[in-house]
Amino acid sequence: MSATNDPTPAVRLSKNLEYLKPSETVSINQETQRRRAAGEDVIDLSAGEPDFETPRLVAEAGIRAIQQGRTKYPATAGILELRAAAARHLSLLSGGRPVNADHIVVSTGAKQSIFNACMTLFGPGDKVLIPSPAWVSYPQIVRLARAEPVMVPGDIEWSLKVDVRALEKHRDGRTVGLILCSPVNPTGAVYTRAELKALVEWTRERGIWLISDEIYRRIHFGSGPAPSVLDLPDELLGRVLVIYGVSKAYAMTGWRIGLALAPAPVAKAMGALQTHVTSGASHPAQWAAAEAFGDERLEDEVAHMVEAFRHRRDLVVAHFRQHMPGVEFVEPLGAFYFFFRVDTYFAQRRFSTAAEFCERLMADEGVAVVPGDAFGDPRWVRMSYAASEKDLTDALGRITRFVRAMEEATASA
């Protein structure tokens, strides 16, 4: 049926979606799957999830919960067993500091925890600072809360991180929030304890809420977990929320369990909000997550996964230094992402954005990566090394061939 004869009336969508953009990481993943289904040879380095399987003990706990009939509505803020296990886990990660399980709200993934936090704390007229480059969903979630995201560019001399001077330049009387991620998606940079302390003190002095996304905390290539705001004294944390979960460290992205640790009044409000959104996270999945947090036997599996990511990080860094020495990058200290710069090719008129670079790389070499446009900086590209060493080595060879072909074309022009 032609468009002119289509009897379907025009659809008028809500203004809530007026400024909302689809997730580019999801879109690229869908395009990768489409090409693979068509028989194309595509290596996917766009994924934001570990390539490991959920640990057997965790999977069995989820199956056992189903077999035991734990499939009814759960407590809205999360089953006590999971909140208690998460509190003990977070306490151990930060040297035994007390963590109150009553201040934890379990949600359907860390993304929903961030959504709940923004909907609870921010509203029309408010501004929320977001260090850039940043995960694609932060500004979109802030907009859904009817607040205004304010991107704060990171300093290349400082692994694209921000400090209080950068934040202060972008603050005004409407600034009420800061969303921080460490280890950082998309760069893999990690804020030190001293850097976190300076940021927390700055927000506290100005009455600004800090949402600290620590979903990658366990995937850290230094000693122990990455530094956390929970390593700081209690008196600094009155306006701080911590976002955490099982997706990354325990390879449980599809189980959809995340959590927020918040001051008591905020946790209560987030729980109330959740009663009207999801009524709580999947009941069997919560039991699986409780196993992940509570079973010490899983620590060896987490350590093995982190060591595998460290090895792959080293492989990628060494390859770029040896075979693409002219390409600038951020050396990652955590997570499983590698962020490299491509705007040198803009001046040569090969491309005008990182998105075009990624499109050509996919078309010419069959490698899927994510343009920095998605993260707020169109000069860069994010690739994930959450892939097998074989695929990673093959993809690095293809990227090198692609970059060299551009350089040769420029030299002969």
Q: Where on the chain are the PLM-derived regions?
A:
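PLP-dependent class I/II
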Residues: M1-L13, E18-S23, I28, R35-I43, ...
